[in-house]
Regions:
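Acidic, metal-coordinating helix/loop segments flanking the phosphotransfer/catalytic sites
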Residues: 32-48
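Alpha4 helix (beta4-alpha4-beta5 surface) of REC/receiver domains from two-component response regulators
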Residues: 62, 83-102
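His-Asp phosphorelay/catalytic-motif detector in bacterial-type signaling
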Residues: 47, 72-80
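Conserved acidic segment of CheY-like receiver
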Residues: 1-12, 17-21, 49
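CheY-like receiver
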Residues: 123-143
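Conserved phosphotransfer microenvironments
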Residues: 51-69
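Two-component signal transduction core modules
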Residues: 49, 102-103
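C-terminal output helix
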Residues: 107-116
Length: 143
């Protein structure tokens, strides 16, 4: 059975994510603080980790970077990570944290479900809602 860790200090975040995926036959492990993620990962060996960007004690990006460092030093296998983002600036930080996906708050359960399924298959999933807007070149606006 595949396992997903959901790490968020806000109960509503954990509830909304788990509700969207609970019928997929996945074991869901909930964690309240970023510092609790690494020990649980070592114990449970999950298939996916979902981190709230604003998680207490250790933010989502810092937790993601810690997990990547552990994997790079071969103390952990590589495990896909998704972040739950609040605002457009978070996209930049999520990219810097080298996560395989992200979800945007307020959550869309269909997107969460689709994203979790993609990430568990080894694909990436990026909700494009907060992506920066690309404007046409300045000279093409004149005319």
């Amino acid at each position: 059975m595949q396992q997903v860790i959901i790490a968020a200090d806000a109960p509503w975040v954990r509830k909304e994510i788990s509700s969207a995926i609970e019928d997929l036959g996945i074991k869901i492990i909930e964690v309240n603080h970023g510092v609790e993620v690494l020990p649980i990962v070592k114990q449970e060996n999950p298939n996916l980790i979902i981190l709230d960007f604003q998680i207490g004690n250790m933010g989502g990006p810092a937790t993601a970077l810690e997990l990547h460092l552990e994997a790079e030093s071969q103390r952990l296998p590589h495990i896909p990570i998704a972040l739950c983002l609040d605002r457009r600036a978070d996209v930049f930080l999520a990219k810097r944290a080298k996560v395989e996906g992200w979800f945007i708050k307020p959550f869309n359960p269909i997107k969460i479900r689709k994203g979790v399924q993609a990430l568990l298959k080894g694909d990436s999933y990026y909700d494009s809602y907060l992506e920066p807007i690309t404007l046409p070149p300045k000279n093409s606006l004149q005319g």
